[in-house]
């Protein structure tokens, strides 16, 4: 099994502060992620001055400013992104960013970005999808979130990507709910199983906006190949996404939990594992003498019983042994041996 690709979604939780963003890269590395992801945008190209805030944004940032004014404060200048990109790579992390406008697509293309994350809000943006699909970048991978979308809408977006030359094997579809945070009853992990059936030619992942790290860990047995999770250094920081993000400690628990579950999945066939083999002799039982038995005596339910250890004749041969004559003397608790009866393998 290929390890799940874990992405720490820094997004705009740096609040436009380069030093905060750099510290977040450090914490993501400590947590054990494979990559960090940012959001690249020019607020004036992304949001109209008439666009309202989302309900969750109003809840955490108030309604005194517009969505546009709020988002302007979260921009990360291109030159600072380049520095963060280089810094993250120096730590051994992959780094990529989601573009939200055409200028930002061009900028990230100039950086020869390999992984292109299409956010849920751009799923039905035809010119946006076409532009990313047509980028002449070698080994380009596309990851597409599906929050707020129906299955038919997802198929429409995938058709645009495929019609513009992107192979299904180079696309990862992320199950996603765009409510921040997503109520557990709306997470719908079973949708991942549905995706694996409907979109069997594609890679399937999970963009988790639910509280904590529980759903992320629980998604592993569904066969995901990619997971992203928003994280923050402090859930009380000003900004729209902090309260729906995990802390560095929670991010580490997510990473550790994912890796532990990956190792735990194992085989569909029930096997005796190397780690438990040594316990067979300790935990299983054998047929033993229940009292002193003289050579020639018949084995009966009175003079034999079953006790540990499990390296003698198996109790599964109980009725076969009854009525047989002892071939030697046995002391109480001594393992019974008899011609034709093998000792258990341990």
Predicted regions and their residues:
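Catalytic cores and adjacent flexible loops of soluble metabolic enzymes
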Residues: 1-346
């Amino acid at each position: 099994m290929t390890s799940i690709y874990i992405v720490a979604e820094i997004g705009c939780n740096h609040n436009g502060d380069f030093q905060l963003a750099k510290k977040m890269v450090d914490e993501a590395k400590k947590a054990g992620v494979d990559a960090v992801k940012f959001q690249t945008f020019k607020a004036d190209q992304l949001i109209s001055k008439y666009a309202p805030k989302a309900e969750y944004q109003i809840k955490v940032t108030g309604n005194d400013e517009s969505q546009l004014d709020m988002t302007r404060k979260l921009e990360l200048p291109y030159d600072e992104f380049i520095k963060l990109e280089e810094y993250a790579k120096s730590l051994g992390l992959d780094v990529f960013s989601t573009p939200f406008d055409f200028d930002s697509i061009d900028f990230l293309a100039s950086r020869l970005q390999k992984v292109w994350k299409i956010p849920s809000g751009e799923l039905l943006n035809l010119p946006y999808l076409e532009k990313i699909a047509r980028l002449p970048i070698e080994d380009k991978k596309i990851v597409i979130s599906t929050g707020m979308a129906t299955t038919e809408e997802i198929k429409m977006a995938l058709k645009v990507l495929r019609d513009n030359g992107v192979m299904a094997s180079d696309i990862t579809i992320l199950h996603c709910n765009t409510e921040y945070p997503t109520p557990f009853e709306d997470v719908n992990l079973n949708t991942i199983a549905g995706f694996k059936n409907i979109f069997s030619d594609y890679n399937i992942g999970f963009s988790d906006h639910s509280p904590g790290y529980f759903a992320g860990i629980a998604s592993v047995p569904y066969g995901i190949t990619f997971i992203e999770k928003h994280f923050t250094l402090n859930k009380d920081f000003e900004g729209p996404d902090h309260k729906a993000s995990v802390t560095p400690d929670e991010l580490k628990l997510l990473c550790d939990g994912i890796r532990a579950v990956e190792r735990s999945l194992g085989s569909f066939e029930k096997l005796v594992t190397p780690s438990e083999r040594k316990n067979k002799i300790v935990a299983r039982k054998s047929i033993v003498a229940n009292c002193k038995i003289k050579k020639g005596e018949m084995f009966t339910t009175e003079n034999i019983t079953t006790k540990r250890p499990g390296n003698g004749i198996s109790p599964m041969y109980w009725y076969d042994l009854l009525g047989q004559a002892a071939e030697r003397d046995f002391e109480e608790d001594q393992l019974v041996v008899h011609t034709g009866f093998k000792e258990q393998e341990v």
